[in-house]
Amino acid sequence: MSHISLSAAEEAGTYVIQLERELETTLKKVQKSMEAGIQAICQTVETKDPYVAGHQKRVSQLACTIAKEMGLSTWQIDGIRVAGMLHDIGKITVPTEILSKPGRLSHVDLAMIHDHPKVAFDILKNVDFDWPIARIVVQHHERLDGSGYPYGITGKDILLEARILAVADVVEAMSSNRPYRPALGIEEALAELARGDGTLFDSEVIRACEKVVNQRGFKVELSSSGV
C-alpha cells in the first residue's frame, strides 16, 4: 500500500514539475511577444522622428539606473523600463515639422506638444501590462508644484515611477542634441534639476540621479548623428 502511495506521490511530483516548466515556457513566450511589440512601436515612432526613438531608449536606461539606485524592486524597475521605452509614443500625432522645428514654437505648436501625454495614455490604456504604464506615461511631464502638464497634478499624486521618468527625461533631453540647439551637457542638466529640487522634481530622485552620474559614472550615450 505504501509502495502505491509513494508511486502516486512521485507521479504527482513529476506532473507538478512538468506544469512548472510549461508555465515557465509560456511566460517566456509572453515576455518575448511583449518585447517584440514594444520594439515594433518604437520603430513606428522612429520612422516619424528618429530623435524620439533614441531619446526613449536612453531615458529608459537612465530611469532604470536611478530606480535601482533608489532600491526599487525588480518588478518596479521593469515597469519603468517599459514606460521609458514608450513615454513619447504620443508624439506620433505631432506633425514632423513641429518636432524638428529649429525655431521658436508657436502657441499652437506647444499645445500639440503638451497634448502628447494624453495621446499616449489613450494608446496604452487598454494594453494589459503588468504595470500601470499608461498612468506613468501620462504623468511624466507633471511637476511637484502643479506647473506641469497635461493635468497639473501635484506632489505624491504623481506616481513615483513618473517622477523618476521626469528626471531622466530632463537629463537626457538637455544632454542631447535637439533640432533647435546643440547638447547643453549633463552638468547643465544636473544644474537644472538643482534649480527645481523639491519644487519641480522629487528630491530623492534627484539625489539618486546625481549619484549614478557623479559616483557611478553613468553617461548619456549619443550616436554619431546625435540621436
What do these predicted regions represent?
Residues 2-39, 43, 50:
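Amphipathic alpha-helical coiled-coil "transmission" helices that mediate dimerization
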Residues 28, 35-227:
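Metal-dependent catalytic cores of enzymes that make or break cyclic nucleotides
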